[in-house]
């Protein structure tokens, strides 16, 4: 059985475009179309797809080592993450995924995100520059405690009535976001590029 590509993802895909956003949506669609449950060959495909989208080269020996040592548990964690409605990972689970993804918390977060973008946010240097401080070093942000803190913050915000109301208003104003979870909408607000100045100052036309 194959999982369907989520409607909100499929609707936003524009194969003729070449922007980074469109490429990432296409990657999401490829991963969403993989069989359920994932088998090890699919898990390896996933981590290669994720690192094909990143500037860092995936270490195949590290992937092989993680598979050889923890294949069954790795599949359990990946399949549970793929079907989760909220983050349910333990420290051991995240450590296992980190070992599978170049010993990188950033890589593990992106693997989780592409498996289940509605639940697991991306954690990388761009996010850390906003969430922590500008110019934060990799040694400071590429660790599990920072990812847990960021993920926990987003999910705490997602349960706040004021945030829920703001996200509902955004959904109403932007039909393209219909069906997106609160976590995804918060990411949109936090990391959407600023509007050009001419659009900020433009006044509505008189009737």
Mark where each language-model region is.
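Short hydrophobic alpha-helical segments that form membrane-spanning helices or hydrophobic packing faces
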Residues: 107-113
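An N-terminal alpha-helical hairpin/helix-loop-helix interaction module that forms a charged
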Residues: 1-99, 117-207
């Amino acid at each position: 059985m194959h999982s369907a590509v989520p409607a909100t993802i499929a609707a936003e895909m524009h194969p003729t475009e070449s922007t980074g956003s469109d490429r990432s949506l296409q990657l999401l669609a490829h991963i969403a179309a993989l069989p359920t449950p994932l088998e090890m060959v699919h898990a390896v495909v996933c981590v290669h797809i994720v690192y094909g989208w990143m500037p860092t080269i995936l270490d195949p020996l590290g992937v092989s080592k993680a598979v050889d040592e923890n294949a069954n548990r790795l599949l359990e964690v990946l399949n549970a993450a793929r079907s989760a409605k909220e983050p349910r990972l333990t420290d051991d689970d995240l450590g296992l995924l980190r070992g599978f993804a170049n010993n990188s918390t950033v890589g593990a977060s992106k693997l989780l995100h592409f498996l289940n973008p509605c639940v697991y946010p991306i954690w990388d240097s761009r996010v850390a520059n906003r969430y922590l401080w500008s110019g934060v070093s990799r040694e400071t942000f590429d660790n599990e405690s920072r990812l847990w803190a960021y993920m926990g913050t987003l999910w705490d915000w997602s349960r706040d009535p004021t945030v829920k109301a703001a996200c509902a208003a955004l959904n109403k104003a932007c039909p393209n976001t219909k069906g997106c979870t609160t976590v995804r909408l918060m990411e949109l607000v936090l990391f959407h590029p600023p509007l050009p100045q001419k659009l900020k100052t433009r006044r509505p036309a008189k009737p």
